[in-house]
């Protein structure tokens, strides 16, 4: 029995595994006060970058795919929404391919 138990690999249960990683402070790509040249109106003003702390916290995690999947797993409606979006994208691609094929005839 002792020989049998030595063949198994022990699983580490250290506290490091249970601790969630701390949120890293994200630094924006441009300093505060920089003109972003996003104006689309003739008489409008250019948008100006703000301090990083003035933006909402969720903004820094929008592009993280892990973050989207994590929240979708928590929310069953969100998971259904992701599945619906995927199906809509697939249908749109198919429609575009069909239209391109028909335009070549």
Curated annotation (Swiss-Prot):
Major localisation: mitochondrion
Compartments reported by the entry: Mitochondrion
Span of the transit peptide along the chain: 1-24
GO cellular component entries: mitochondrial inner membrane; mitochondrial large ribosomal subunit; mitochondrion
More details: Present with 1100 molecules/cell in log phase SD medium.
Complex and partners: Component of the mitochondrial large ribosomal subunit (mt-LSU). Mature yeast 74S mitochondrial ribosomes consist of a small (37S) and a large (54S) subunit. The 37S small subunit contains a 15S ribosomal RNA (15S mt-rRNA) and 34 different proteins. The 54S large subunit contains a 21S rRNA (21S mt-rRNA) and 46 different proteins.
Name of the featured protein: Large ribosomal subunit protein mL54
Species: Saccharomyces cerevisiae (strain ATCC 204508 / S288c)
